[in-house]
Structure formats: C-alpha cells, structure tokens
Regions:
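Short aromatic-hydrophobic micro-motifs that form the base-stacking/packing surface
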Residues: 20-22
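Short, glycine-/small-residue-rich phosphate/pyrophosphate-handling segment
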Residues: 64-85
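Short acidic donor-binding/metal-coordinating loop in glycosyltransferase active sites
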Residues: 24-26
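Short, well-ordered beta-strand micro-motif
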Residues: 62-64, 103
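Conserved donor-nucleotide/metal-binding helix-loop-beta segment in metal-dependent transferases, i.e.
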Residues: 29-54
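Conserved alpha/beta core of the MobA/IspD/sugar-nucleotide pyrophosphorylase nucleotidyltransferase superfamily
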Residues: 83-134
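Conserved hydrophobic/aromatic beta-strand scaffold that supports enzyme active sites
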Residues: 49, 60-62
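Short phosphate-binding loop-to-helix
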Residues: 1-18
C-alpha cells in the first residue's frame, strides 16, 4: 500500500492527470472495461473504484490528480476506499464492468479461470516460452 501511495504521489507531482491502480490478476479484463472506468471519471473529475466480488477487495481504482485515496488494498478494501474517499470529500463512482469482478487470488480461482478458457494451455505455453527467452 505504501508503494502504491508513493508512486501515485510521484505521478501527481510530475503532472500526470490520473493514476489507474490495476492488479495483474484480472483474467477477464478487457479494454472496454477500462474505457468504462475512464468514462465514469467524467473527464477525471471523479475517482472510480471497482469491487472484487469474492472478498470485497478493490480490483481497480482510478484517482485523478489531486484526489489521492490512501491505498488500503486487501480483503474488504472496497468499503474502506469508499469511506476514505467520503472522508476526503472526493467524488467517486463505482465501475461494475464484469472484467473487474473476478481476480485470481486463490487456487480455486485459477481452476475456474482455466476451465473457462479453452485456450488456457496454449496461452500458458506461449507465455512460458516467451519468458524463457528473456
């Protein structure tokens, strides 16, 4: 959480208009989900948050410059982030795009993801070979 806060503050200090904190375990995320989140920010005048369905965590948060919400990621963080935004008088919207709902936190999540993707083994082999050559 400290690293996310420090990186966000650094980005704001150099004039970045907004920061999207996005975990790397969102297997069903697609560009339309991100577009929806950006649209909900109404031209970066509102923060936007997306909930993790399984544990009530936060699977994405978009913070416009000047609207830092202290990162508090982990189980139950969705409600914590909303509370922190309210305390700081930061306007916030909730993004309910399907790609943000499911994350790969537990072994059973990976199993469900694998079963839902007919190309899972092919993609896994592609990444395995690609990473071997780095």
């Amino acid at each position: 959480n400290k690293v996310v806060k420090d990186a966000t503050l650094s980005a704001f200090e150099i004039g970045i208009e907004g920061v999207l904190v996005l975990p790397g375990d969102l297997g069903f995320l697609n560009p339309n989900d991100i577009d929806q989140m950006i649209d909900l920010s109404e031209g970066l005048t509102r923060a936007v948050i997306a909930r993790a369905t399984a544990d009530g965590g936060t699977n994405a948060i978009l913070m416009p410059n000047g609207m830092l919400i202290d990162p508090s990621f982990g189980p139950g963080s969705f409600e914590r982030h909303i509370h922190l935004a309210n305390v700081a008088n930061i306007p916030m919207s909730i993004c309910k795009a399907k790609g943000f709902e499911f994350d790969l936190d537990r072994p059973e999540d990976l199993l469900a993801y694998r079963q839902s993707r007919s190309d899972f083994d092919e993609v896994l082999n592609w990444w395995t070979n690609k990473l071997k050559n780095i």
